[in-house]
């Protein structure tokens, strides 16, 4: 079971280079497999959009919480580490031009030695997507096409590649360098909806269900696997990433995740960990319980 840790942006220190490096280097030294960074290009004050992972419909983060660009943050971390995986959770796909994003992801993956894993989502904040020039009502279709665009560019050779889609088209496009893996940067799909589960089954290298547990989680995994089968894919080939908190992670949690077919768990600090030292203590205790180092 691979274990990752989520950047504790709740502390309000994710824009501080010393804090970022201490967190990342500690995670690597303790034996964690990856760190994961979140994205919001902008946060709209007093947004009318409902945050789907809170019973109040409001995000637990203040509007002025520092949220660095995740790819820039991971590039910074890549140069200061040697083994640590570099993940997003999630990158809001409709905020990005996929031609440019393909180059950015390939560059990060190449220069980090193939350590990149990207979790994409369609986003929940209408105003953010619109501020980035996207269409909230078409965000599912644009995400599907973005995945196709990036994979086409990564697979294209010296003669270039052609693409004709609903939102993007090009002829003879060459995009180098390529990702380290011939299959490209792994693209996981994150979300809580049936649409996200189906997208993961149809198109994803993995599925990262968010905010789900119990019967809802089992149902989402089943939807993903059915969609994979319907698309002619092997459902077992779609990786599954689950979540937990650092203090609750133990051997029984790993067994539970493995029974669902997961090979990776992303761990967050508890609400009690309100300082960096407290987060690092939870990480160290978890690493000792799981015999990581």
Where in this protein do the model-derived segments appear?
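Active-site-adjacent structural elements that line small-molecule/cofactor binding pockets in enzymes
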Residues: 1-293
């Amino acid at each position: 079971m691979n274990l990752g840790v989520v950047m504790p942006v709740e502390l309000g220190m994710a824009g501080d280079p010393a804090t970022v490096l201490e967190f990342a280097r500690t995670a690597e030294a303790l034996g964690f497999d990856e760190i994961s960074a979140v994205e919001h290009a902008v946060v709209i004050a007093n947004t009318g959009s409902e945050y789907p992972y809170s019973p109040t419909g409001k995000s637990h983060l203040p509007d002025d919480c520092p949220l660095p660009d995740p790819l820039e943050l991971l590039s910074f971390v890549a140069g200061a580490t040697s083994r640590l995986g570099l993940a997003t959770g999630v990158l809001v796909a409709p905020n990005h031009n996929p031609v440019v994003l393909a180059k950015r992801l390939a560059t990060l993956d190449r220069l980090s030695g193939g350590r990149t894993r990207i979790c994409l989502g369609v986003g929940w904040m209408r105003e953010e997507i619109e501020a980035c020039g996207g269409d909230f009502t078409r965000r599912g279709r644009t995400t599907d096409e973005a995945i196709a665009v990036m994979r086409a560019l990564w697979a294209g050779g010296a003669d270039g590649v052609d693409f004709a889609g609903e939102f993007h088209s090009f002829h003879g496009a060459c995009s180098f360098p390529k990702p380290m893996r011939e299959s490209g940067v792994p693209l996981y799909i994150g979300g809580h909806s049936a649409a996200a589960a189906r997208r993961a089954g149809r198109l994803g290298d993995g599925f990262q269900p968010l905010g789900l547990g119990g019967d809802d989680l089992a149902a989402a995994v089943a939807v993903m696997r059915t969609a994979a089968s319907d698309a002619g894919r092997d459902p077992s080939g779609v990786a599954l990433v689950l979540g937990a908190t650092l203090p609750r992670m133990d051997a029984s949690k790993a067994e539970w995740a493995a029974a669902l077919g997961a090979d990776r768990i992303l761990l967050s600090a508890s609400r009690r960990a309100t300082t960096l030292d407290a987060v690092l203590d939870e990480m160290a205790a978890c690493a000792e319980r799981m015999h990581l180092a």
